[in-house]
A protein has these predicted regions:
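Unchanged
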Residues: 1-121, 126-142
C-alpha cells in the first residue's frame, strides 16, 4: 500500500466505544472499504468526544517527518511524549492514511490482553499446546 499511497499508514480496527480512551482514534474520509484519508487523530479520547471508533492498532508505516513533529510536541496524555501528537502534526504537511484491517489483535498494554495473548498462543503452540491445555484443565477450580 505504501508504494501506491506515498504517505504514513496507520493500521486501525474498530474498537468498542468504551475502549476509545485506550487508543489513538482517527477520523477522516474513507477512500475505499479499507483506506481512510485521515483528517484527525486524537490520543485516548473519552467515548463522548471520540471522533470515531477506529483505534490505531500499534502498526505504522511512518515517514521521517514524524520525528521532527515529535520533537516539537509538548508532553501529552499522561505527561508522555505521544506518537499520536507527532502524527497529528504531520497532518498539516503530509498525507496520513488509515488501513482498516481484519484479524486477531491482542492489547498487550493491559494485563488482561497480555494474559489473553499468552493463553491463546500457548494453546496453539505446536510443541507445548497439548501440554498447556492439560495443565489448564488440571488447575483447581475455586
Amino acid at each position: 500500500q505504501f508504494e501506491a499511497l506515498q504517505g504514513c499508514i496507520l493500521a486501525v480496527q474498530e474498537v468498542p466505544a468504551e475502549h476509545t480512551k485506550r487508543y489513538g482514534i482517527v477520523a477522516g474520509q474513507m477512500q475505499s472499504d479499507r483506506i481512510m484519508d485521515v483528517s484527525q487523530i486524537v490520543e485516548k479520547p473519552a467515548p463522548e468526544v471520540a471522533p470515531s471508533r477506529l483505534g490505531v492498532a500499534g502498526r505504522y508505516i511512518l515517514t521521517p517527518g514524524v520525528f521532527e513533529q515529535i520533537r516539537q510536541q509538548p508532553r501529552g496524555v499522561g505527561n508522555e511524549i505521544q506518537l499520536t501528537d507527532g502524527i497529528a502534526g504531520l497532518l498539516r504537511n503530509e498525507k496520513v492514511y488509515a488501513y482498516r484491517y481484519d484479524g486477531k489483535r491482542y492489547d498487550c498494554g493491559s494485563k488482561e490482553g497480555f494474559l489473553e495473548a499468552t493463553v491463546e498462543l500457548a494453546l496453539q503452540h505446536s510443541q507445548v499446546g497439548a501440554w498447556f491445555k492439560q495443565y489448564l484443565k488440571a488447575l483447581p477450580r475455586e
